[in-house]
Curated annotation (Swiss-Prot):
Keyword Secreted: no
UniProt-annotated location(s): Cytoplasm
Source taxonomy: Archaea, Methanobacteriati, Methanobacteriota, Thermococci, Thermococcales
CDD domains xref list: Cmr3_III-B (cd09656)
Pfam families documented for this protein: Cas_Cmr3
Protein's name in the database: CRISPR system Cmr subunit Cmr3
Length: 322
């Protein structure tokens, strides 16, 4: 596995999936980059280098595997706050499931408020050792608003009344983890100082390291009560995900509970067909799947679940809970 670090030159814009037209929709909002955005930048570079087999021309997925991505700050890699960490007065408290008539339930305590936590806090959470998080330890992504003016495509002049607001993200780092089947991705990326990301072609400087992050090498031991924290969007229905998990771990699940929010819409532009991709819906990052196995199972540090795994979707970090 190699780790690629992108350092954006300036603010970033990854537009949400809904249509935007200056004047009729006054705000162009940015979302946190999807894994396929990073995969697309790498596929474009490989295509430019003539490595069509590695790109997967005409295929939805490439030959290489983007294990997942994370964003970062000066504190290092950060991850979406798990959905079972609930805001109280001065702290964010971890709320684990209880039982009701043989079913796992989540007690209704407080409200979820989105944010990010450092890798060290997340690792403590995955070990089942985290009870609460101080409010000042929850990280927010800085947004910057700027004014845009629509230009006529034909005349290249300003169109009257077509002003709009653009909401950019100030992201310091984007990390990507790649499994390379022999495409020479490390050497190719190392020869470039920067790449462009997304349809807006925002510049980001590139660094490559072949050291696997510690979060992928954790030892959790065996347990009947495990959790799987989705750090990237996971495409698929929860029932399908549970069945896949049983098959991959060769273990029967007695009960499960997904703590999540509304699905994330995933779209994009098909460079081969030159048309928009169909919209898919995914379990959002930060979601947590609590499971009870019939027998003790060795919990993996991470596992890929759902569809389009090679595009970085479905990265689930293993953990335990009591």
């Amino acid at each position: 596995m190699i780790e690629v670090t992108f350092t954006p030159y300036d603010v970033l814009l990854f537009r949400e999936s809904r249509p935007f037209d200056a004047g009729s929709e006054s705000v162009a909002r940015s979302i946190i980059p999807l894994p396929q955005t990073v995969a697309g930048a790498i596929r474009t570079l490989l295509f430019y280098k003539g490595l069509k087999n590695c790109v997967g021309v005409g295929e939805e997925e490439p030959e290489f595997t983007l294990v997942g991505i994370a964003i970062g700050t000066e504190k290092g890699r950060i991850y979406p706050l798990p959905f079972n960490i609930i805001k109280s007065e001065k702290f964010y408290k971890v709320v684990n499931p209880g039982r009701f008539l043989g079913k796992l339930i989540l007690p209704p305590k407080g409200k979820y408020k989105s944010g990010y936590v450092t890798e060290s806090i997340l690792e403590k959470y995955l070990k089942g050792e985290l009870k609460e998080v101080e409010e000042n330890k929850v990280i927010r992504i800085e947004k910057e608003k700027r004014i845009g003016i629509k230009l006529s495509r034909e005349k290249k002049v300003v169109e009257e009344g077509m002003l709009y607001t653009v909401e950019f993200l100030r992201i310091e780092k984007i990390y990507a983890w790649i499994e390379d089947p022999g495409c020479g991705i490390k050497d190719i990326l190392s020869s470039y100082e920067f790449l462009t990301l997304g349809g807006e072609s925002r510049v980001a400087f590139v660094e490559v390291d072949d050291k696997t992050p510690d979060i992928f090498n954790r030892e959790l031991g065996s347990t009947k009560k495990a959790l799987f924290y989705f750090s990237t969007p996971t495409i698929g229905k929860v029932g399908e995900i549970v069945q896949e998990l049983e098959k991959r771990l060769n273990a029967k699940i007695d009960d499960y509970l997904l703590v999540s929010s509304r699905p994330t819409a995933i779209s994009g532009w098909d460079m081969h067909e030159k048309k928009p991709k169909g919209t898919k819906f995914a379990i959002p990052p930060g979601s947590v799947l609590f499971v009870e196995f019939k027998e003790e199972v060795e919990v993996p540090p991470y596992i890929k679940l759902g569809k389009l795994k090679k595009l970085g979707y479905g990265l689930a970090l293993g953990g335990i809970w009591e």
